[in-house]
């Protein structure tokens, strides 16, 4: 079992869209450029599902006893917390220089029945920044959309037609957007965010060619499940824009210890997310906690060890270990509670 926090190192994963320059600057890289590694996977025990398999791609690298190790080699089940057999969460920094393809992630039930997976992929976006004033996301079907219409647009590969079926929401730093499994969505160009999600990498895509012109394989589109199952994955509930905002855009609430609760377990059982901004905060959490430092300054105390904090640093704090944040601005990411043994 771990007795101290461990520092996580940048762990970039290949994706089908270009980005990452803003993210890399946030992480301290000089002269950063966009490429096809636009995500940094944090507290990740999940291997990336890509066109070409790369061993351990996506598994977070950490500093441990002066060495660079995989988090899977350092963290034990006991470090997750009582009743936990796995991490129950995956966290990413994500920076889009291009619009991501229109997509959907499976619900828990769909993932179990179709992919034999214990986890679907409900996720949440916390917007850190944007490259332009009109940076946006697409979310939820408009009122006129039916499965038949969606299937016709998919077969025609009418991309503009499919985009017009989704609500477009301009984002602002500090926005918190919950995307439940089955909800159609696409992250637009110029969004920099923390994405917290269930620990899987299942993405069903309806665009067969990426924005950059790459032709996707059937495996990349639906993992061999077939186009009918791909269409089954979508929730065809029609919504007005006001309904989308009410259901998916969360309103943070202030906690007793000064932290801002961005995502609560009453919002979803899949994860929780809080923001500490300058207040002194401490806890002994029954689960592990992931700390993402948003600004230089302040410190973390963990089991009497001091950690001066810099922007872009990420820490894994094991379960049942006291930690304190002083004069820091940081996100606190918590794993899900669904199915946890008492």
Predicted regions and their residues:
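Transition-metal
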Residues: 1-146, 209-253, 273, 338-339
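Intrinsically disordered, low-complexity linker/loop segments enriched in Gly/Pro
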Residues: 124, 129-178
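Non-heme Fe(II)/2-oxoglutarate
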Residues: 189-192, 198-220, 253, 312
């Amino acid at each position: 079992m771990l007795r101290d926090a461990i520092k996580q190192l940048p762990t970039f994963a290949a994706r089908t869209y270009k980005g990452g320059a803003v993210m890399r600057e946030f992480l301290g890289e000089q002269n950063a450029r966009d490429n096809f590694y636009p995500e940094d996977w944090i507290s990740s025990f999940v291997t990336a599902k890509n066109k070409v398999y790369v061993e351990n791609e996506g598994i977070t690298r950490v500093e441990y006893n002066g060495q660079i190790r995989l988090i899977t080699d350092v963290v034990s089940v006991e470090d997750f917390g009582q009743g936990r057999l796995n991490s129950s969460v995956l966290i990413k920094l994500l920076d889009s220089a291009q619009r991501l393809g229109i997509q959907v992630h499976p619900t828990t039930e769909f993932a179990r029945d179709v992919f034999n997976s214990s986890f679907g992929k409900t996720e949440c976006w916390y917007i850190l920044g944007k490259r332009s004033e009109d940076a946006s996301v697409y979310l939820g079907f408009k009122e006129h959309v039916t499965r038949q219409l969606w299937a016709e647009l998919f077969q025609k590969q009418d991309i503009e037609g499919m985009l017009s079926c989704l609500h477009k929401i301009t984002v602002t730093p500090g926005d918190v957007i919950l995307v439940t499994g089955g909800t159609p969505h696409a992250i637009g160009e110029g969004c920099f965010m923390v994405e917290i999600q269930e620990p899987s990498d299942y993405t069903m895509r309806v665009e067969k060619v990426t924005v950059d012109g790459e032709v996707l394989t059937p495996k990349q589109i639906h993992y061999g499940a077939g186009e009918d199952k791909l269409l089954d994955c979508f929730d065809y509930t029609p919504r007005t824009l006001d309904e989308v905002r009410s259901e998916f855009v969360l309103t943070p609430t202030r906690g007793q210890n000064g932290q801002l609760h961005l995502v609560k377990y009453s919002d979803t059982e899949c994860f929780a997310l809080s923001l500490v901004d300058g207040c002194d905060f401490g806890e002994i959490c029954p689960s592990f906690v992931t700390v993402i430092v948003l600004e230089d300054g302040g410190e973390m105390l963990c089991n009497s060890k001091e950690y001066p904090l810099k922007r872009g640093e990420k820490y894994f704090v094991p379960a049942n270990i006291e930690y304190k944040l002083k004069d820091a601005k940081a996100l606190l990411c918590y794993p899900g509670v669904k199915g946890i043994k008492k």
